[in-house]
C-alpha cells in the first residue's frame, strides 16, 4: 500500500511512513476483491491523484478510487456487499484506451483529465458526482507525450 506523508500537528513537523489502511470488512474475493494496484502481476502504482473527495491510484490501465465517505477515507474495499453504495470504491479499466498506463490525473473544469504516454482522456464530473454505477473514462486524444513532468 502507498506510504503516507502527514502533518503531525506541530509547525513544520511531518511524518512519512506506512499508514493504517482499512482492510476488507465484508465479502470475499468474489464480491469484494482486492484493488488492482496490489496485484504483483501488474505494473504496480503508476500514478496518484484525487478527485471529488476520492484518492485515485493508477495501476497501468486500472483506475481505482477510494471510498468518498467520511468514515471510509482511504478505504479501497466496499463496506457492504448486499448493496452497492454511491460512496463505495470505484475500480475500472478504460477499455477504449488499448493498454494505456496512466500516470497523471489532473482536475480541470470539474472533470479529471487523464494522461499516459500515448493516450489522453477524461473522467467527466462536471454534471454528476462519481459513483460506482456511473464512473467512466472517455478517450479524448492519442498523442505521444513526454511524461517526465506533470502536464
Give the role of each language-model region:
Residues 1-31:
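N-terminal accessory interaction module
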Amino acid at each position: 500500500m502507498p506510504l503516507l506523508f502527514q502533518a503531525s500537528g506541530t509547525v513544520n513537523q511531518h511524518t512519512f511512513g506506512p499508514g493504517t489502511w482499512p482492510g476488507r470488512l465484508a465479502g470475499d474475493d468474489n464480491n469484494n476483491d482486492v484493488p488492482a494496484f496490489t496485484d504483483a502481476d501488474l505494473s504496480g502504482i503508476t500514478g496518484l491523484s484525487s478527485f471529488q473527495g476520492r484518492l485515485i491510484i493508477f495501476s497501468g490501465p486500472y483506475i481505482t478510487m477510494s471510498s468518498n465517505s467520511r468514515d471510509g477515507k482511504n478505504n479501497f474495499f466496499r463496506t457492504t456487499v448486499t448493496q452497492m453504495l454511491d460512496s463505495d470504491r470505484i475500480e475500472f479499466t478504460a477499455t477504449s484506451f488499448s493498454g494505456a498506463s496512466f500516470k497523471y490525473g489532473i482536475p480541470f473544469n470539474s472533470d479529471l483529465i487523464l494522461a499516459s504516454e500515448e493516450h489522453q482522456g477524461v473522467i467527466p464530473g462536471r454534471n454528476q458526482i462519481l459513483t460506482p454505477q456511473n464512473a467512466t473514462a472517455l478517450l479524448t486524444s492519442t498523442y505521444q507525450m513526454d511524461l517526465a513532468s506533470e502536464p
